[in-house]
Amino acid sequence: METGCWVLGGEFEDSVFEQRPERRPEPPSPYRAKLCEPQWFYEETECSDDIEVLTLKKFRGDLAYRRQEYEKALQEYSSISEQLPSTNFAMKRDVQEGQARCLAHLGRHEEALEMAADLESKATNTDHLTVVLHLHLAVFSSLQSREHTILCLHKLIALHPLNPWSWCKLAEAYLSPGPGLPAGVSPQGQKSSASSDKAVGPSSVHSGTGSLLSLPTTLPENALLSVEASGSAQENMPSLARRREEAQMEARRKACASLLRARLLLQLAQSQQTSFALEKNLRTQQEIAGKVKDFNFREDTLLLMEEAMGEDIVPEKIKEELHSEVKCVGPGALTAMVVASSKEFEDKWFRKIKDHFCPLGNQFHVEVEIIA
């Protein structure tokens, strides 16, 4: 290279070659976690943030509810509801749910159902719908209304078919002999003038546009049986006894099938669980095994049930259920996500099992008619 030539960009500032002063790292400031004394939210606060004050009140209501002081919790929730801004939808829904649950525990089921119906009308996503259905389930379980409890579980399972705990609850509901809905209480929280010995007319049951919990407009099966028996008791007793026995057997089959599906779901989920979640899973599987054994069904019957109830179960679906996203949709789409009736649900899940037992049932009916 000739003298005097220079390379473009080949010049450097002298500061590049200077030794930089050594930096001594300062010790990081110690982390100080905020320590809260037990029941700190009962202390007087000078906070000027209205939302912060309302949040403290909600904590007080939640603690009272946990202690089963439902009247006190209801007072806290009600005072919050009056002061909450209309734009705070999340807390408003939480508070309203708390109010409804307190009312149910206090025996004010009609008011609880009215609040549940209001939450239902404002549901805009699958999480909202799940909360509404769980709320209805709590109210109807408190009322010991077997028919409506089962329908709530059908709707929950239609929304979350891979949830094993809902299937366990459904099995329990099928085996419970609870009475029907008390007179004067309608499924949607409105007064019903229908008497206890008549079918409830369509006009007496609130089923607003797009209602998610459209409940049957007839009395539960046990009420219908009692009405029929009162007409000609002597003539109908053998027939009623047979029907009652068949209904009990069908309920046992549905309960067993529900437990088998719950066990299949738990078995698939256990590989992704640890600690207390895994312990609960394994303990529940053992309990299910004991209950299934108590049904005394034949082994080939149990295999048929297990095959029918596990047709849609694949590991990929379990992962999707565990990490599912909240779907924000309109009321019409939410309504389409749940079943319209128990018949629709049972046709989907138990039809194959029922068809397996139909020949035996038909043969039984023929034998009864010949003997008669």
Curated annotation (Swiss-Prot):
Biased composition (Polar residues): 187-196
InterPro entries, A to Z: DUF5588 (IPR041404), TPR-like_helical_dom_sf (IPR011990)
Name of the protein described by the UniProt record: Uncharacterized protein C8orf76 homolog
Chain spans, region Disordered: 183-212
Source organism of the structure: Mus musculus
Pfam families tied to this protein: DUF5588 (PF17826)
